[in-house]
Amino acid sequence: MATKKITLVIPDAGPLISLATGNALDLLLALRPGVRLVLTDFVYFEVTVFQDRFLDGAQIADFVKKHQAAIEIVPTSIGEFAIPGIQEKPRNNPNVPWPNDLGELSISSFVTTSKDFNPGEPTLVLIEDDWFTSHAYAVPGNVHLLSTSAFLDGLEAQGVIESAALIRSAIQSKRPGFKIDFVVDKEAQKIPEGTSWRESFSRDKRAT
């Protein structure tokens, strides 16, 4: 039985920052026709709110603006609730709570509420820490979890990039906390056929 190919890609904040740091955001656009790239409102807010202070935030904002026809920014209940309060006072104000898991929760919320059928369309969520793997209850059954490092390895195997190691090295040189050895490639748990993501990316579709 053939596995279900991914039709929706949603990166968390960590992968966006790392790919920006490694000048590799364009890899997210190497998608075959019919595959959507989505950012939740809170993840986008989280990575760009201080774009005037951090180069990666400015890079992400410019990237999204340049490719707005190919990137969807979707509203979520998390973003609707949290963003206005944070905008009123800076994040570095200790009196303003900013839980670390709001981005992940916004992704989980979007995937869960946007389903037209069960278990839902095969969805790839790019991650960079163990929040999703440690909170299985928050992972919708149609979600395939993939870490940044595993993503780069897969793109190399698919011929989209020449060297995953070079991009990882570029990321780590500017982002020492990047976890090169955090490798996760976990299929969706409630799609009986299983899920695959590599075929959803093509070397011919990479942006320039």
Language-model regions, residue ranges each:
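Feature 3881 marks metal-assisted phosphotransfer/nuclease machinery
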Residues: 1-11, 19-69, 93-105, 109-122, ...
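Acidic catalytic patch
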Residues: 69-97
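Conserved SAM-binding loop
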Residues: 125-126
